[in-house]
């Protein structure tokens, strides 16, 4: 990974898992890393751990709840008020397959509302800081959006994006991850059309052995069973540190391309420490559907850009 001194990098969901390991690696390379966390206590624990593992690094904790558009707006306003550049935005945070349908503070299904709408709003509101970075640096700013191999089974149900008619935990998750990937691709197209130097890149971690696996809202019994399964199949899955590699590649590699999608190159893209171009399902390349999704995101969030 290239040296990152002087770059300000914001990572959502950075208090644990892939987000934490990405923050750790970037901090060790000299970046100024902002850990965006919903829970202050968990964020402070993560920040203390990071300072222990990487002393004398430049990190800060910011409170941001992607399941609340008012929280997103408040954070973005505070950040823009500091008049400082943002060189890399990593849209990492995610909710995975809660067994019962839940809603965000704004009434959206929690996976679509957090994974797609929250990051859409955050990206749009922080665009001035990314453009400021472009004006002050010779390097192009980057927006990295985390998708998933689960997008391959995803379908955008525009008649029921909020899963109010029928809720399936995994179908809602797959839809949200397809939405993330389509957002990243559509964002790239719009940035290019606007002749913007900002890059939009997607990545996925493979299947990490803590890939929201035990952190989702399941009963103690379900978590116990999932824990046993996770231990049994660890050999086939990525660690969180390995899972962070595609994110780091997208955020820092000189040959990462805007509009690209990167993931591990091991069996079925499930694991591996080699990163390369990831497989894209045909539905993720549907430009008409992506444009429609963009309009829906604008309408639901009230955030309009590009």
What are these regions (language model features)?
Residues 35, 64, 235, 282-285:
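Pocket-edge positions in alpha/beta enzyme catalytic cores
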